[in-house]
Structure formats: structure tokens, C-alpha cells
Amino acid sequence: MRWLPCLAAVVVLGQALGSDEKLSETPALTNPNPRINVIRDDASAIRWKIDKQRVDGMVEAGLLQVTGSENPTAGWLSLVSPEDTVGIKVNAGPGQISGTRREVADTVVRGLLKAGIPSKQIIIWDAKLEDLHKAKFDTLAKRHGVRLAGSMEAGWDESVVMDKAILGTLIEGDVGFDPDEEKDSRKSHFSRLITGEITRIISIQ
């Protein structure tokens, strides 16, 4: 069996939101012409074992395709700057194998550090810190001196709200959740990580 890491456009970047904003669900928030680059290497993982060198090559190839840059450092600096706080969004909940692979996140972190992004301004984040620890992202963070953060632990910014068209039931961790009473809401609040700290987001799924 082979596990194949494929990177769709390598990374998905977006500028984080400022505070005191209210968002509505509107086509203006989406890119009508998204660009997707898929990088494939069948030998990048065999029997769940990751070939780090091949993963490095995949990320580099995708980065250069997306940015049109001559080298990886120039590619990263065309997307972020040393003044940014870069949030690397991972999917830690499914665990070490089914979720975001640490080897891919490691390649991205090393690329950002080489491009001059200070380690204290790189945050690996997901919904819960507990999930990040279970998936061993804490070892990656310690190795490079970058930070770990969870949206739930950071809290939600009640001044930045997106109104959704579909009514949803509040769950544990949501603003307004009450374990003794079922509540519905169309409002979605953004993490304080996004509204108050992170200025660029790299999503690795």
C-alpha cells in the first residue's frame, strides 16, 4: 500500500482579517478563477513511510509553479514577508497518518525560516491544541522553535462575524454554546488567531 501526498496548489494563502468587521456570505469573498497545481510522486511514500527528500522536491516544484519564481526562497517571499505572522493551518484531528503529514509541514516551515521569516512569527495551528499534540506537531514546533496554537484555546472574536445562509446547531467551543440548552445560529465567529495575530495563512490538508 502507498500513501500519496498530493499538494493542491501546494498551499492556500489568504490575508487574515482585521477586527471590527462583519462578513456576509457573498461571491465577492471567493476567487472565481482559482488556480490548482497538483504535484504527484508515486515514490514519495511507500507503506506509510515518507521520503522526506521527495516531499521537499514536491513542495518546491509546486511553489515554483504557483509563483513563477526562480528559486524557493524567492517563491516564499513573493507570498509572505518577514513582517508577517504566518499561520500554517493543519488538519491534526484525524491523527498522524490520516491527517496532515508532519513531513509536509516540516518542509514548509524550513522554507519559511530559510526565507527569513522569524520562528516566533510562524504558528502551526488547528482547532484544538490537544489534537496538535496527539499528532506530534509539538515535536516539529520544538525542533524549529515555532509556535503551536489552537483556535478554541485562543478564543473567538465576537466583533468579527460571518452570517451563514444555513442555520446550524451550536456545539462545544462555539460562542453562545450552552450544554443544557440546544441553540441554533447563523453566525460564525472567527478565531482571535486570525483576527488579531496571523496575517498570512498557509493551509496544508
Label for each model-derived stretch:
Residues W3-L7, G14-Q205:
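N-terminal and secondary-structure boundary signal
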